[in-house]
Swiss-Prot record:
Name of the protein this chain belongs to: DNA repair protein homolog YozK
Residues binding Mg(2+): D16, D115
GO MF annotation terms: metal ion binding
Organism whose genome encodes this protein: Bacillus subtilis (strain 168)
Cofactor(s) the record lists: Mg(2+)
């Protein structure tokens, strides 16, 4: 077993942005990302298309999650179904990363994915 007391102490922060694609899409539409029902789908024109992200409320109240299919989303006027906006997602992710750089050196930020 490793004796961690011999290692230097460091503070590490891990950030995972909650339902990132859905949250960014919701904010862009003027919606509350925590309470709205929103799914980002690979292609809204194809019923078999995969849900890339679902808002927390859509997950909780309708059981729709990443990997679900468009045809599984019930027809409900409260649910927003949108196509991905990759340029927007990349821009927002970049801005958030730049925010981290205000507090820690760039070499200390290790980005795993866009979200």
């Amino acid at each position: 077993m490793t004796d961690y007391s011999q290692f230097p102490r460091e503070n590490i922060l891990c950030v995972d942005m909650k339902s990132f694609y859905a949250s960014v899409s919701a904010v862009a539409m003027g919606l509350n990302p925590l309470t709205c029902y929103l799914a980002v789908v690979g292609n809204t024109d194809r019923q078999g298309s995969v849900v890339l992200a679902a808002s927390p409320a859509l997950k909780k109240d309708f059981g729709i999650k990443t990997g679900s299919r468009l045809f599984e989303i019930p027809e409900d006027p409260r649910i927003y179904i949108v196509n991905p906006q990759m340029k927007l997602f990349i821009r927002v992710s970049t801005e958030i990363t730049k925010l981290f750089y205000r507090f820690v050196p760039e070499k200390c930020v290790h980005t795993y994915s866009i979200d």
